[in-house]
Amino acid sequence: MQIKRLQIDDYLCLVDFDIVFDTVSGGSSTILIGENGAGKSTMIECILNILMSFDSPAIEKQIDYSYSMEYNYAQKAVCIVQSNHNYRITVDDVFCEGSYKRVRSFIQSHSLFPQRIIAFYSGVNNKLL
């Protein structure tokens, strides 16, 4: 999975947050370096919440911010946009929009997420566990 862009409207310290990652053919690793409190761990936590929300209705209900995430996975270009629990999911040129229940089945039928996600953090943070 290679994240290309992440936009968050208001999650903890990420307010009007918009980051574009450089992407290279064949994938690459990204390292986040910055001052304490800059939002590195918060961004990772937010990405994990987005990904886990499609496996857990309880996590989805906790997401009270709008977001957009563009990424490549398994030779597919994916864009997920959520605002007020209304979704628009685009996979290449195919899209689905609507409620959580509707888009969740679409996502599961298209295998849009990796089976395992690894986040490494060198400080103390109980939220990423």
Regions found by a protein language model. Name each.
Residues M1-L129:
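P-loop NTPase switch/coupling surface
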